[in-house]
Amino acid sequence: MTLKIGIVGAGGRMGRNLITAVHNAEGVELGAAFERKGSSLVGADAGEVAGIGATGVKISDDLSQNTNFDVLIDFTRPEGTLEHIKFCVANGKKMVIGTTGFDDAGKQAIQAAAEQISIVFASNYSVGVNLVFKLLEKAAKVMGDYCDIEVIEAHHRHKVDAPSGTALSMGEHIAKTLGRDLKTHGVFAREGITGERKRDEIGFATIRAGDVVGEHSVWFADEGERVEIAHKALSRMTFANGAVRAAKWLNTKQNGLFDMTDVLDLNNL
């Protein structure tokens, strides 16, 4: 049976890539596409907006107008995603959430929703990035207590949150491995006379420029040597393909909160 996918933010950069990824994938089809109220794209064919030709799926501005989907993929903004979660819970729809920038209350709302529906919630849907998470845990075990750790990330000028959700996830993987709390050990800005760096800090640096899709590098810097673990995304299709893969994996789950570690079975490496 073909899995039907709904996409919110269908006219955005990520939305168009998601439509293309669904079109190219086996065992799935586009069932619904949505944009914000007032968008000039409402009523347009989603496939034509994405540049793949007509699909017969018209973009709507209201989830209740088209419930022809099993899984909703959401890469929008926290306030919108939280409303979409309410709809999916009420209508028994599964979700793949790639939105970043949630506060603690937003994350708690996602956890609560996962008691009723199945959700994959990840900061990054790239297979490579999720493999990097595991490599960072390995490096932290070996070097973390004896070196300085810095997370450096770069994204396009339109990204609205900083540090990126992926950078924060990298820091969280490292902090958890070292038994540290990122809220107290993370340093997110340095300016002026800061004093010497503390050994147990996990530093973050952010770059916003041009059309950078996404670059992340983590330094484990000791006296006389430095290990760098890096990932560069060259196309948003990397994230879109991963999200569709997550949606297909999620189809067999009735409820629960999962991430790409579960989808890729990385804990069994």
UniProtKB/Swiss-Prot annotation:
GO cellular component: a single term: cytosol
Main subcellular location of this protein, as a coarse class: cytoplasm
EC id: 1.17.1.8
Gene Ontology terms describing biological process: diaminopimelate biosynthetic process; lysine biosynthetic process via diaminopimelate
Binding site for (S)-2,3,4,5-tetrahydrodipicolinate: H156, G165, T166
Binding-site residues for NAD(+), renumbered to this chain: G9, A10, G11, G12, R13, M14, E35, G98, T99, T100, A122, S123, N124, Y125
Keywords for this protein: Amino-acid biosynthesis, Cytoplasm, Diaminopimelate biosynthesis, Lysine biosynthesis, NAD, NADP, Oxidoreductase
Reactions listed under catalytic activity: (S)-2,3,4,5-tetrahydrodipicolinate + NAD(+) + H2O = (2S,4S)-4-hydroxy-2,3,4,5-tetrahydrodipicolinate + NADH + H(+); (S)-2,3,4,5-tetrahydrodipicolinate + NADP(+) + H2O = (2S,4S)-4-hydroxy-2,3,4,5-tetrahydrodipicolinate + NADPH + H(+)
InterPro entries referenced in this protein's UniProt entry, alphabetically: DapB_C (IPR022663), DapB_N (IPR000846), DapB_N_CS (IPR022664), DHDPR_bac (IPR023940), NAD(P)-bd_dom_sf (IPR036291)
Disulfide bonds: none
NCBIfam families, per the entry: dapB
Family from the record: Belongs to the DapB family.
Primary role: Catalyzes the conversion of 4-hydroxy-tetrahydrodipicolinate (HTPA) to tetrahydrodipicolinate.
Annotated protein name in UniProt: 4-hydroxy-tetrahydrodipicolinate reductase
Species whose genome carries this gene: Actinobacillus pleuropneumoniae serotype 3 (strain JL03)
Lineage: Bacteria, Pseudomonadati, Pseudomonadota, Gammaproteobacteria, Pasteurellales
Gene (UniProt): dapB
